[in-house]
């Protein structure tokens, strides 16, 4: 396996080169713009291509070292694609709303994740059957709310090693928190964005669904290439890694080991 390949033609067909109306531009993006067409800024794909490849290499290197990648995209065009792409490569995502402190207050977020796991277990085991319908409804709604906010990171087990972000204006808080903690950020920067604070900027359209799908497909492919490299380096069976490995969470492993030890021996 190798890093996914792409061509400038593919980027053009996906609409990656279309920026926003010239009235909405950010002057800090001037060096990444090719020109203006019909009142729309055109992004310079001659720069986007190598910058996208560099970002993919960075993501690949993170997973090759056993690191975690967090996909972030909460706008409606990106939400489903971000979740699907992260799941496809065994990584993590935030696609509903970025909660303040999601990175910088990880201890509190971890407590909420622990609560979500408890509710998952209770619902799966039928432990709520003895409660009144009202009590069951309250707990079900609590679970849905937590799952919507934290379901994509409940198995992350710690802070991510790199973020991949669609729309830095929409996800400004995620960028700020990552910068504060020194976590690298890969991000799509449209003509109305501020590239400051982005470790691996990728000039491109952050609104068109086809463009978003293209970025996410390439990043998930880079993740999988890194995972495969890690497995190969460790002497594992690459052919057995068709399904991206899901990271084990220590408390879950400990619980499973305890159950196995308590089980009657055949």
UniProtKB/Swiss-Prot annotation:
Keywords: Ribonucleoprotein, Ribosomal protein. CDD domains: RPS2. One of its GO terms (biological process) is translation. InterPro entries: Ribosomal_uS2, Ribosomal_uS2_bac/mit/plastid, Ribosomal_uS2_CS, Ribosomal_uS2_flav_dom_sf. It holds the Pfam family Ribosomal_S2. One of its GO terms (molecular function) is structural constituent of ribosome. One of its GO terms (cellular component) is cytosolic small ribosomal subunit. It comes from the Bacteria. Belongs to the universal ribosomal protein uS2 family. This is Small ribosomal subunit protein uS2. It comes from Paramagnetospirillum magneticum (strain ATCC 700264 / AMB-1) (Magnetospirillum magneticum).
